[in-house]
Amino acid sequence: EIHILEHIDRLVEIFSACWPMYAAMPAVLKDAIERSYQNAGWDLRESESNRGIFPTFFDLLRVLPTVIEESHYSNDTQSDYVGALCTRVKSLTNGIYGSVFCAEDALSDAELFDENVIVDLSRVSAMETKSLLMGILVMKLQEYRMCSGVMNGKLRHVTVLEEAHNLLRKTSAEQVQESVNVQGKSVEMLANALSHMSRAACNRLFHLADPAFTGLTR
């Protein structure tokens, strides 16, 4: 079973990897995410919910300004945080991304990860958005496998990463202060998740398909 605080830490790590954030932005975002879960009925310490629902980015967008306003930062810093964090979260509630992240008729985890599904990101041009989508998908896959894995049985599911160099590009994971190496952090996060699931022996196969393997990270 995945503890809700463990899930939140993974989610914040994904945002920190994919969005340029500096100073206390990750801490403010984490505080807002935790409050969103509490508003949805979650007991964070016990990892229990009396309603069995999860907050959406709409819920996060509602609490972010309040969390920033309650902080002890200067007015200029608060204004910067509202502009940076709220604008980015709002972009996940509009257009096609709103349909992906906030749809009420979304596929269940069982349908997404146990059935025959193709996730086509070929038309997502922005690297930050593509990294965020893949990061959340891999996080959901990892948590789903950790909760439903059957050890040492027959092969049950195959996950294929086509043109894997777009996700596992050979690059440095180092970053300088107050900047984010989007590709490096995303590669590191994805590789660690795949490695963890492989070690867990959950009867799943991960196949990397790429015409140029020399461009892949090790």
Kindly label every feature range from the protein language model:
Residues 1-217:
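P-loop NTPase motor domains
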